């Protein structure tokens, strides 16, 4: 992995240091309409940011599209960006994904730094080099692998988040626990997410990022073990795309919902312990509620799964678990088994 991840203790000093290693003729900051208001003022106090040009795009994942991408390209072009410029992506996963893609493609690539401001972006989107946009009703359909030069994690930004966004990011942490150790999983399913202890959460963020870093370093382009990070995402991306046409849900909620049928399949096909599955499902249902799908939605959801980037030769590809930390990549399931898992999701 070519990016450096910094757990911030003094954001200004760390940003100055990062910028000194990213030589640039012009500096840009990408925000969305939410982080422009909530987070940008923190950076604008820093002397190193006094010349930075701000580009702002509409907030929410529904704007993670070609139109917003073109807005960023236009902002860079009109701001006089060259191949030697640098862009800071200040925001959640939508900003770091789209901003990373914009920076990777503008003039064949300029340097960029991610400063994630949501829990989801801290533990998932900003680390690992995946960039991209949604296209044709499908999640992250167009993009490239390209590392930011730095990721600066300042957990003070967690104080700007509402409960729903904390829950969204926490779903990826729960996934990291499942693919890591019993001790990490146990702490995660025991955590009081309704009344979070912020200091404990900040420590857990560091642990979660280390899980992803360790996996990405082994497999930067998702040829093998990095597929572990797709746990919950085959069903999850289908749920998210399905919801986009009705009532959109946050990515982390889709992943949490996706863990339920995928752990069900893990019990049925790879021997995951039923009790661990039940504990995880109970935690998810208590903290995330449910998604109101019916049997009539099954064919659409399965069709969406067939469009998943993880598939090979038209076969839906799953990551399953044999136990906590026992990862089984490149697993398959029949249409009948997928429908049984959806039945379990609905009826539990």
Question: Model-found features: residue ranges?
Answer:
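ATP/NTP phosphate-donor binding region
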Residues: 1-86
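Non-catalytic interfacial helical region
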Residues: 76-90, 97-114
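Active-site segments that bind and position negatively charged phosphate/pyrophosphate groups
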Residues: 190-299
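Generic secondary-structure signature for well-ordered alpha-helical cores
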Residues: 78-81, 147-150, 156-163, 171-183, ...
